[in-house]
């Protein structure tokens, strides 16, 4: 049953990082593309 808790925590971490990047400047690890 612990696997479910780990999946939930992992999802929350990914979501937090995703929103943090989304509301910040675009990622810089790739060359800037026209958009």
Curated annotation (Swiss-Prot):
A matching Pfam family: PsbT
Disulfide bonds, paired cysteine numbers: none
Transmembrane segments: 3-23
Keyword hit for Transit peptide: no
Superkingdom of origin organism: Bacteria
GO biological process: photosynthesis
Topology of this chain in the membrane: Single-pass membrane protein
InterPro entries (alphabetical): PSII_PsbT (IPR001743), PSII_PsbT_sf (IPR037268)
Localization per Swiss-Prot or TrEMBL: Cellular thylakoid membrane
GO cellular component: photosystem II reaction center; plasma membrane-derived thylakoid membrane
The entry's keywords: Membrane, Photosynthesis, Photosystem II, Thylakoid, Transmembrane, Transmembrane helix
Homology family: Belongs to the PsbT family.
Function (record text): Found at the monomer-monomer interface of the photosystem II (PS II) dimer, plays a role in assembly and dimerization of PSII. PSII is a light-driven water plastoquinone oxidoreductase, using light energy to abstract electrons from H(2)O, generating a proton gradient subsequently used for ATP formation.
Complexes and interactors: PSII is composed of 1 copy each of membrane proteins PsbA, PsbB, PsbC, PsbD, PsbE, PsbF, PsbH, PsbI, PsbJ, PsbK, PsbL, PsbM, PsbT, PsbX, PsbY, PsbZ, Psb30/Ycf12, peripheral proteins PsbO, CyanoQ (PsbQ), PsbU, PsbV and a large number of cofactors. It forms dimeric complexes.
Protein name (Swiss-Prot/TrEMBL): Photosystem II reaction center protein T
Organism: Nostoc punctiforme (strain ATCC 29133 / PCC 73102)
Gene name, Swiss-Prot/TrEMBL: psbT
């Amino acid at each position: 049953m612990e696997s479910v808790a780990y999946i939930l925590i992992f999802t929350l971490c990914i979501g937090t990082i995703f929103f943090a990047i989304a509301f910040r400047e675009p990622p810089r690890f790739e060359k800037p593309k026209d958009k």
